[in-house]
Amino acid sequence: MSIRKTGIVFQRFGKQFKVFVENQTLVAFAQKKLQWKRDFKLLVGDKVTLENGVIVAVEERKNTLVRPKVVNVDQVVIVQSLIEPKINWQQLFKLLIHFHAQNVARLVLVITKNDLEFEPAEKARLSELTSFGYQLFFTAPNADLPLTLFTELQNRFSVFMGQSGVGKSSLINRLDSQIHQAIQALSAHQFGKNTTTSTVMFPFQNGFICDTPGFNVIDFPNLKQLAAQHFVGFASLIGQCHFSNCTHQSEKGCFIVSAVTQKSYSLWLYESYLKLIN
C-alpha cells in the first residue's frame, strides 16, 4: 500500500533532496518523469508530494526568485549595513526591482551595525523607503533585536539575503541560536567572505528562514525593462503615463517626470532610477 505525504524541499545535494514532512526530515529522490522534464529543476521551497519516499508531484509555484534560486517565498529580508561595508544603493534597488517583479508580497530591510557612525543622510534615505511599504529595522551587535522583527518572521517563509560582510549569518544566529552559521570577519579590502555557500532553509516560529550566499555584485536579466515597471514607488504612478511603454525619461506625458517636477515623487529616487537604467 502506497503512502502519500506532502512536504517542502529545504535542501538539495546531488540528486537527493531533504524534505520537511510532518515536522520530520526525509531524504528523497525525484521520480524519473520529473527529472526528465525539460528546463525543470526542484528548488528550495518547492511544495511536493511524496509516495513511499519518492517525490512524485510538485505544486504550482507562486513565485520564483532568480538569485537566490528559491520558490514560494512569502517575504524577503534584505540585510544591509550603512558602513563596513558601505551601503550600495544600486544593488539594493536591483534587489527591490527583482522581488517586486516576482510578486514577493513583503519586503523587509534590516540595517546592521547601527552602533557605527554613518552619514545621517543615508539613514534618512532609508526612512524614506518606508513610505512605500517596506518594513525597516535597525540592529547593533550589543543591543537586543527588535521584538517586532520576530513578529514579522512568524508563520512565513522568509529568505535572507545581503551583500557579503553585512552580518547576515550573524543576524540569523541571533534570531535562533540553534541555527549555526560559520562567520568570518571582513577581509583587509573591506569585502566580506561568503559564510554560506548554498541555499539552506530552517524551521523558525511556525515558518521557515532561508539563508543564502552573500554577494558583492549581483545582476538580473532584463533589468532595464523591469525597472520601468517595478522601481521603488512606480507601481501607483505608471498607469497614468501617456504611453504604456514609457521609460520615464523624456517621453511626452510621463506622469513620473511630472511627479518629480511637482515634488510629489522623490528627486533622489528618480535620479537613482536614471543612473540604474543608463
Swiss-Prot record:
An example molecular function term from Gene Ontology annotations: metal ion binding
InterPro entries given in the database record: G_CP_dom, P-loop_NTPase, Ribosome_biogen_GTPase_RsgA, RsgA_GTPase_dom
Note accompanying the cofactor annotation: Binds 1 zinc ion per subunit.
Domain of life: Bacteria
Keyword Membrane listed: no
Metal-binding among keywords: yes
Alphabetical UniProt keywords: Cytoplasm, GTP-binding, Hydrolase, Metal-binding, Nucleotide-binding, Ribosome biogenesis, RNA-binding, rRNA-binding, Zinc
CP-type G domain sequence ranges: 62-218
Names of required cofactors: Zn(2+)
Residues binding GTP, per UniProt: T112, K113, N114, D115, G162, Q163, S164, G165, V166, G167, K168, S169, S170
Subcellular location(s) per record: Cytoplasm
Principal place of residence: cytoplasm
Binding site for Zn(2+): C241, C246, H248, C254
Pfam family, one: RsgA_GTPase
SUPFAM superfamilies: P-loop containing nucleoside triphosphate hydrolases
Coiled coil start-end: none
EC number of the protein: 3.6.1.-
HAMAP family to which the protein is assigned, alphabetical: GTPase_RsgA
Quaternary structure note: Monomer. Associates with 30S ribosomal subunit, binds 16S rRNA.
Physiological role: One of several proteins that assist in the late maturation steps of the functional core of the 30S ribosomal subunit. Helps release RbfA from mature subunits. May play a role in the assembly of ribosomal proteins into the subunit. Circularly permuted GTPase that catalyzes slow GTP hydrolysis, GTPase activity is stimulated by the 30S ribosomal subunit.
Family statement drawn from the similarity comment of this UniProt entry: Belongs to the TRAFAC class YlqF/YawG GTPase family. RsgA subfamily.
Protein name: Small ribosomal subunit biogenesis GTPase RsgA
Organism: Mycoplasma pneumoniae (strain ATCC 29342 / M129 / Subtype 1) (Mycoplasmoides pneumoniae)
